[in-house]
A protein has these predicted regions:
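Glycine-centered, small-residue-biased loops immediately flanking beta-strands
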Residues: 50, 73, 147
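C-terminal alpha-helical "lid/dimerization" subdomain adjacent to the S-adenosyl-L-methionine
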Residues: 4-9, 17, 21-26, 30, ...
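A short glycine-rich, Lys/Arg-flanked "PGG" loop and its adjoining helix->strand segment in the class I
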Residues: 133-145
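Conserved alpha-helix/loop element of class I SAM-dependent methyltransferases that forms part
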Residues: 31-50, 65
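A short SAM/SAH-binding and catalytic strip from SAM-dependent methyltransferases
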Residues: 119-131
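A short acidic, Gly/Pro-enriched loop at the edge of an enzyme's catalytic core
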Residues: 108-119
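Class I SAM-dependent methyltransferase SAM/SAH-binding core
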Residues: 53-109
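A generic alpha-to-beta junction signature in SAM-dependent methyltransferases
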Residues: 44-46, 69-70, 96, 143
Length: 206
């Protein structure tokens, strides 16, 4: 049974940030996930006019990076957490509702038209998608034919990941093979995985 101590309560904000500790977590995400995001983004040949969706946009730092990578495109962010949406909107205030559009929503029911995006990103968030197969099918639905889906994760070993999954409700750590299989089932045809220790970047094309 999971201990209800203070640290575990704070860590619940990694999946759906709320309140003061949620905002602290979001600030930390913007800082400490930067190197992971940059390494992942280097695996994609970004085009200036792409429309890109970042799922689980958190504190909004990756939206700002995508705005720079696609200077003539539109960047969208979605997050289950109202706190995250508010934080990300403030972080990207300069471009908000011009080239940057951020809203609250669930990955299992994305509020976008079929084939709307050239690329979709997911940084440190797939752990919390439930049911994950439904979520991946939704990603495939809103991605254009030939579009790119980038997943970047710091954890890819379920056994080592127990230090987190035993503390954070609903968190699941997947192996690269598990994610690749689920991506194939969701309709992705070309999948490449880059792994360095436990960090993985999966680039999947529809």
């Amino acid at each position: 049974m999971r201990k209800k101590n203070f640290l575990n309560k704070v860590l619940q904000n990694t999946s759906c940030p709320q309140g003061f500790w949620g905002r602290m977590i979001l600030r930390g995400m913007n800082c400490f996930h930067a190197s992971l995001a940059n390494r992942g983004m280097k695996q994609v040949e970004w085009q200036p006019n792409w429309n890109v969706l970042d799922i689980g946009c958190g504190g909004g730092a990756n939206l700002k990076r995508l705005l720079n990578l696609c200077p003539k495109g539109n960047i969208y962010g979605i997050d289950l957490s109202e706190e995250s949406v508010s934080f990300a909107q403030k972080y990207n205030e300069k471009d908000l509702n011009k080239r940057c559009f951020i809203q609250q929503g669930n990955v299992c029911s994305l509020p976008y038209e079929d084939g709307f995006f050239n690329a979709i990103t997911a940084f440190e968030t797939v752990y919390f998608w439930s049911p994950v197969d439904k979520a991946l099918s939704e990603v495939a639905r809103v991605l254009r034919k030939g579009g790119c889906f980038l997943i970047s994760l710091e954890a890819s070993d379920p056994e080592l990941g127990k230090m987190w999954t035993e503390r954070i409700d609903g968190m699941v750590v997947y192996t690269p093979a598990e994610l690749e299989e689920r991506l194939h089932e969701a309709g992705f045809s070309s999948i490449r995985t880059i792994r360095k220790k436990e960090e993985i970047h999966i680039i999947a094309y529809k």
